[in-house]
């Protein structure tokens, strides 16, 4: 009887695993690109926020990217 809940959970996970294995569509690729751009922008702003006002030169090396 202890295995019954585990078996039911595994049965519920099988359909979600099948959908995760499907190939990406054009929309998925565009969304991944959007998330990559957002992550890169947040990392750049995070790095700039770590600079002290007296060390402003540490932020200027990233401006050309």
Curated annotation (Swiss-Prot):
Swiss-Prot/TrEMBL keywords: Amidation, Disulfide bond, Neurotoxin, Secreted, Signal, Toxin
Modified-residue entries (Glutamic acid 1-amide), positions: 63
Entry GO MF terms: toxin activity
Signal sequence, start to end: 1-20
InterPro entries with a match to the protein in the record: T-conotoxin
The record's account of how the chain is modified after translation: Contains 2 disulfide bonds that can be either 'C1-C3, C2-C4' or 'C1-C4, C2-C3', since these disulfide connectivities have been observed for conotoxins with cysteine framework V (for examples, see AC P0DQQ7 and AC P81755).
Superkingdom classification of source: Eukaryota
Tissue distribution of the protein: Expressed by the venom duct.
Keyword Secreted found: yes
GO cellular-component term (any): extracellular region
Residues that make up the propeptide removed upon maturation: 21-48
Compartments, as annotated in UniProt: Secreted
Domain notes: The cysteine framework is V (CC-CC).
Family classification: Belongs to the conotoxin T superfamily.
Protein name: Conotoxin TsMRCL-04
Source organism of this protein record: Conus tessulatus (Tessellate cone)
């Amino acid at each position: 009887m202890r295995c019954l809940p585990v078996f039911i959970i595994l049965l519920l996970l099988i359909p979600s695993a099948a959908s995760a294995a499907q190939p990406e569509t054009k929309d998925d690729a565009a969304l991944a690109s959007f998330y990559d751009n957002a992550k890169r922008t947040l990392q750049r702003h995070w790095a700039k926020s770590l600079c002290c006002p007296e060390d402003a030169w540490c932020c200027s090396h990233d401006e050309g990217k």
